[in-house]
A protein has these predicted regions:
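Hydrophobic alpha-helical segments
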Residues: 2-5, 60, 91, 107, ...
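PLP-dependent aminotransferase-like
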Residues: 1-81
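Active-site region of PLP-dependent enzymes
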Residues: 78-83, 93-179
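Short glycine-biased active-site loop of nucleotidyltransferases that positions the nucleotide triphosphate
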Residues: 85-88
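Structured helix-beta-strand junction loops
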Residues: 39-40, 66, 90, 107, ...
Length: 179
């Protein structure tokens, strides 16, 4: 997924361990999860990919048996549900990135949710600090990313580029999916 999932683990001196995916959902394969758990395992990060929720029944059952905390990465599945329950409601906490390349974006930033009052207070403490304010470099980067998005990725621009590509393909100037 993203370095933002792994870096906090590494910053704490822990070692991230990856579990292979299910080919139909691109989510963690719960059948392989238990084999990756050791006595050092503290957290399972369940990433819901491309709008497909993980098998949260299996993941939370494995975690509960071992006393392991589950945190959900909901960045790519904003609004998705698993068995009638919205993603982000299964673990101790969940987070949603609103970075420019996510399905739901504010450019930068994100959201964390939890049903744990102590953890909620710690998260609020982080938000009250200067850690949540973008630096001048980040503001400049965001401005540049927005300009690139508007120029090259914006739907009208993309449609124009596709039409030009199709035209050039028909004329034999390029080889592509329309040839």
């Amino acid at each position: 997924t993203c370095v933002m999932d792994i870096n906090p683990i590494k910053y704490l001196g822990a070692k991230p361990v990856y579990v292979d995916i299910e080919p139909n959902t691109f989510n963690m394969n719960p059948a392989l999860l238990e084999g990756k758990i050791t006595s050092k395992t503290k957290i399972i990060v369940a990433q819901h990919t491309y709008g497909y929720p993980c098998d949260m029944d299996a993941i939370t059952e494995i975690a509960a048996k071992r006393g392991i905390v589950v945190i959900e990465d909901c960045c790519l599945s904003f609004g998705s549900t698993y068995k009638g329950k919205t993603v982000g409601m299964f673990g101790k906490a969940a987070y949603f990135s609103f970075q420019w390349n996510k399905p739901f974006t504010t450019g930068l930033g994100g959201m964390a949710i939890t049903n744990d009052a102590d953890l909620a207070e710690k998260i609020k403490g982080l938000c009250d600090s200067d850690l949540c304010m973008p630096s001048a470099k980040e503001v400049l980067m965001l401005t540049a990313q927005l300009a690139v998005y508007r120029m090259f990725i914006y739907p009208r621009t993309t449609a124009l580029a596709q039409n030009i590509f199709r035209y050039l393909t028909k004329k034999g100037a390029v080889v592509g999916s329309s040839s």
